[in-house]
Amino acid sequence: SPDSAENVKCADEWVAAAPGTDGALAMSMGHVILKEFFVDQQVDFFTRYNQHYTDLPFLVALEPDTTDAGAADDGGGAAYRPGKYVVAGDLDIPESTSENAMWKPAVLDARTGDVAIPNGSIGFRYGEEGWGRWNLDLGDIDPLLTVHGTATGTARVVLPRFDALDGKVSHVSRGVPVRRLGGRLVTTVLDLMLAQYGVRREGMPGTWPTGYDDPSTPATPAWQEEITSVPAEQVVRLAREWAENAIDTGGRGMILMGAGTNHWFHSDQIYRAMLVLTSITGCQGRNGGGWAHYVGQEKIRPIMGFQHMAFALDWHRPPRHMNQTAYWYVNTSQYRYDTFTADDVDAGTGVFTGKGVMDLLAQSVRLGWTPSYPTFNRSSLVLADEADAAGMAPADYVVDQLTTGALRFAVEDPEAEENHPRILSLWRANLLGSSAKGNEYFLKHLLGTDNAVTAAQAPPDKRPTGIEWPDDVPEGKLDLLMTIDFRMTSSTLFSDVVLPAATWYEKHDINTTDMHPFVHSFNPAIAPPWQSKTDWEAWKAVAKRFSELAVDHLGTRRDVVAKPLWHDTPEAMATVHGVVRDWRTGEVEPVPGRTLPVLVVAERDYTAVFDKMTSIGPLMETVGMLTKGVPYDVDREVEILRHRNGVAHGGAGDGQPRLQTDIHVADAILHLSGTTNGHLATHGFKNVEKRTGTPLHDLAAEHEGKQITFADTQVAPVPVITSPEWSGSESGGRRYAPFTINIERLKPFHTLTGRQQFYLDHDWILGMGEALPVYRPPLNMTELFGETALGEQNALGVSVRYLTPHNKWSIHSEYQDNLFMLSLSRGGQSIWLSDVDAEKIGVRDNDWVEAVNRNGVVAARAIVSHRMPEGTVYMHHAQDRLIDVPLTETHGRRGGIHNSLTRIMMKPSHIIGGYAQLAYFFNYIGPTGNNRDEVTMIRRRSNQDVEY
C-alpha cells in the first residue's frame, strides 16, 4: 500500500511501493524466484506444476529483428525478437494435418527430444477429433521447460524496456538457447522469461545484470528500489519467503488486491507480473492460494439463469452486449482530446504507425473483435428490408454494402447526427455523480450543459486518420435521460424523467457476490412507499406502455444484429497465429464470423415486449441454454416452472411459464443455474466430460437432487453447488477457490494453450512489446497532455498524482451523503494530502483547496495527514456534489466530483478479439475504465470564505 492505510495496521510487513509501480515490485520478486528456484536449483513441485498447468514449456519461434534496435548489434550476432507460438500446422509432423492444426501449440519431449503436441489446447476444444482430448493429461510426454542443455546454439533476442521517466521504449539484448525446427529457430517460453527477467545462465551472450545490487537493468531488486522506493533487501527476502512458503504448503500463497490495480492504463502488465509469482510457484488453483481480486458485488454465482433472463435469451439471440468504456469514449467525444497517437504506447515496432487509438477501435469493430452500438450508420431495422428489395440474403447484403462503402460502421463517423445515442436509461447507476470517467466530458458532449473542460482537442498531426473528423463537435447528443433510483443523485438531477425505486428493504430479490459462497434473498420489511415501485414492477410498467405504443409505431420488424466473435465459441479461432489482416485494406475477404462480426437477423415483435418480459420464451426448450461453452437441456426445468409459476394465457407467451412477479423471476434464475440446481450442474459436467475425457460430474453428484428455491433463501443463506459455470470446486463442503477444477481434474484453462499463459503472441501485443510481462510506468501526462510535471510548483499550486480509491466514509458508492457518514468525515467533499505537500502550498488541515487540470475542477476540504505519501493525493470515490460543494475560484461555478479530474483513455491491447482467450464476451474482457495515471494541480483557495 502506498499509504499507511487500515490494512497496514494488521499486516506483518508493510511494503510501501510508490503508486503505480506494483509491476516493478512484482517483476523484481520474479527475478529472484526465477534465479534461485529455476536456475540455481530446480524444485520438483514447481517443475511438475509448470509442465502441466502453464505455458512455460511451449515453443516460440524467433523472428529476425529488422528495427533499429535489432541493428544495434553488440557483438552477439544477428538479432531476433520473440515471435509466434510454434503449432502443429507449422511443422512436418503427423499432427500437421489434424483438425485445427494451427491451434495446437507444440512442446519438446524430454524423453525423445522430438516435438510433441500435448492435449488441452483450444484446437482440441472444438471439432470432431478433439472429443475426449481437451484435457491436461500429458500421457507419456515429458515437456522440456528449457532447451538449455539440449540447445544447438544461442540467439540474441532484443527485448523492450519502458522504465525511463518518460515511458519511452529502449531495448536490451540477451541470449537464449535455441533449437532449429523446420527452418525456424525456436526456444521455450521459460527461456524467454529468463531473458526478460534478466536471469543469466552459463553461455548466454548479451547484457545482463551483475547481481541483485545492479540498478541499471530491469527486474533486479536494486532496479525496482529506484522506481518503487521499496528496499532491495526487503524484496529479496519476501521473494524467497514466497517461494519457500509455496514449497512448504503446496502452493498456499495468495496475492489479494483491490480494484485500483485495474484502474491504471497499463493494468494488464501489473496483473501479469503478479500472476507470474502465483503461477510459477504453483499457487493457482489451491485453497488458500492464488490471485484474489477484491472487486465487490460483481460475481453472479447463478450466472446461467441470470444471463438468460436478464438478456431475454429465452426469446431472442444473440443479445447486444457492449463494453461501457469504449461506448463512452466514443459518445462523449473523449477520443477527440487524445493529444497522442497509438505510436506513443507501442515498442517502436511501427505496428500502429500513423494511427490513433480511435482508428484501432474502428478496426477492432469492423473485424468483429469488439462490439459497438449503434453498429451502422443506417438503422439495423431497415437493412433486412433493403436486402429483400435487392434480392439478397441480409448478411450478404450488409457485406456488399460495407465493401462498396454504401454502409459504414457508426464508429467510423461518431459525430454524425444519425450515429448519436438518443435515449439513456440509468437503472440504479449514478453515472453522472460517481462512475463516469471524464465526468465533465459527459456533461459537455452527452448532455450539453455546464462543464469545466479546458482540454485542447487533438491537433491535426495527432488525429485519427481512418474516421471522419468534423471541425464542429456536437454538445448535447441525448434527447432523453431517464433514471430509476431510490435516492437523489447528480444523475437524477440531470434527468428528464425520474422513476422512484424501492430500496432493498422494500422488494424481493436475490444476491450473490464473489466474496461469499451463498445465495441470499432480499425481503421487504414494508411495501414500496408512495409512487416507488420494485425494479420488476417499474420495468413491467415501461414494457406495457411501450408495447401499446408499438402497435402504431413499430409493429414487427427484422433486426440485423452484428455480434462480435465470442470467447468460449469456435469464433475465438478466427485469427490464426494472431496475425491481423483487415478486409478494408484488401488483405482478406470480408467474411462474417471470421473477419467481420457475426451477422444475425432477429425478428422482433415490439407489440409483444410486455408479453415476452412476463413469460419464459420457447428458445429454452427448442435450443437449450449455453454458458461458457457448455450446453444444457432445460426442458425439465421449464416444465417445473410451468407448474410452479403457472402459465401465461394469450399473447406471445401463451402456455409458457409466467414471470409476473419478482419471486417468479428469482425462482426462474435459481432453477436455470447449475450453482443452484444440482441436476443441471451434474448434467453440465457430463457434457464437459465428453470433451475432456476426464471425470467431472462427481463434483456435483452429491447435490444432483438439490434445488435451491427462493423460499429456501428466505429461511437462511444457502451454499451454492459446484457447477461448470465456474472454475472452483465446493464439493464436499470445501470453500470456493478459483481454478481448483483445472488443477485437480486436468480441465484446461480457456486459453490458446489450455494452460495459464505468460506469453501472448497477437500482432498488436508483439508490436507493443508486451509478449511477456514487462514493467510499464504510469503514463507521463506531461509528455502526452502538457500537464505540469509531478512535483513542480507554480501559481496554480503543486502537481501531484491524483487517485480515487474507495471511500472511507461511505458504503461503497452510496450513503456518502448520509448524516452519520457526513458527521464522521468532514461534512462534504474532501481531498487527502501529505503534510509535506500541504506545507509546500501553505495548506492547513480543513482548509478549502482546489484541484485543477485540463479535465475539470474540484473544490474540497483538505485532510492533511502524515499517512499519505508525498506527491500523491486521494479524493475518495463517489463523493457526489449534492452537499457542501462551493462555487470554485477557477470558474465561479459549482465544483465537480472525483471523476471531474479524470477521463477515459483506452489501451489498444484491451480491444483485441477473435483470438483464443483474447476474445470478447460480456463482463469478461474489454478496455478498462482507467484513471489512476492522472495528475492535477492542487492549491489553497485564496478566499476561505466560500460561497454556494
Predicted segments with their positions:
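Flexible loop/turn segments at secondary-structure boundaries
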Residues: 4-8, 22-23, 234, 245, ...
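Flexible glycine/proline-rich, aromatic-decorated loop/lid segments
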Residues: 6, 495-522
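Long, well-ordered, tryptophan-enriched scaffold segments
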Residues: 8-248
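Short beta-alpha connecting loops at secondary-structure transitions
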Residues: 11-17, 518-529
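Short, well-ordered beta-strand core segments
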Residues: 14-16, 424, 481, 498-500
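Extended redox/cofactor-interaction regions of prokaryotic respiratory oxidoreductases
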Residues: 155, 161-201, 208-211, 226, ...
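Long, contiguous, secondary-structure-rich segments that constitute the structural scaffold
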Residues: 392, 537-601, 612, 622, ...
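Phosphate/diphosphate-binding loops
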Residues: 478-480, 486-487, 524-547, 850
